[in-house]
Amino acid sequence: EDSENKALLQAICYGLCRHYEQLDFISKKFINKPLRKKDKDIHCLILIGVYQLFFMRMPDYAIINESVATCSQLKKVWAKKLVNAVLRSVQREMDSLTAELDTRPEIKYSHPAWLISLLKKDWPEDYQSIMQNNNQQAPMTLRVNKANNNIKQYQSSLEQAQIHSSAGHLTDT
């Protein structure tokens, strides 16, 4: 269970970094006044909730419930209503938010406008797919210690564990 929690935490952290501009834009639409500096943890909690609502395959009610419960753990009970209201609003407005993001590529793809301009100029047909791919989780890479294993045998053991693999093309390890 610890390794599952660690993997989930890692996925959330990387996802927040990848999609920060988008998540921040969405969260600020539903927060009427800026949070105090000492309440950055609540802002982060909201960002995590928004990320999970948009990008993770978890039930919405569980995301919202856990986010609200975390306010108590942070000893900020006052924030429960805020976190609940923001995340429920995001949940309700998901379709309109997605449509709005489609008109704001620098926010949708979390890329600066200058980079989008360069990509658009150099790859007019492919710039959107390039930005989408920039935001994808990187593939896992394994290096086989050839002193202990043969590459083909290791791939075979991965396949037996129902893990798809392919040999790299840059090195033979």
Task: List each language-model region with its residue ranges.
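Class I Rossmann-like S-adenosyl-L-methionine
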Residues: 1-173
